[in-house]
Amino acid sequence: MDGTNGHPVVDELVDRIDRDGESTVVYLSGELDLLVSPDLQTLLDTECERHPRRLCLDLTGVDFLDSSALHVFVHTHKRLAGESARLELVSCTPAVRRLLSLTSLDWLLATCASSPTAAQRCLRLM
């Protein structure tokens, strides 16, 4: 387990970060909206600089997300894909899955099943 960078907004968004070899799981919580998206992007860019083969975002604790959060996810997906790596959204709520479907991003962004061990499986799969 690893902490965040001590930034107040990021500390409120991130419950914890687990890194295991080539995989990283970021456990997010709260509301992912325009107010926090720039800080979320900075955090994910920092994680991308570690060159994981798989970056999983566990959304179990996320209450709300808007189009700015989707933009962060797409940007991160493209960055990782350019490095032959993968972004996965883990434990998406029905509302998040519906938003991905309505925006046609469900074909672009990989999702993992909603279960307590889904994020841990991401760590073991690579």
Where is each model-derived feature located?
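STAS-like cytosolic regulatory interaction modules
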Residues: 1-63, 75-126
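Conserved G/P- and acidic residue-centered "switch" motifs that form tight phosphate/ATP-binding loops
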Residues: 66
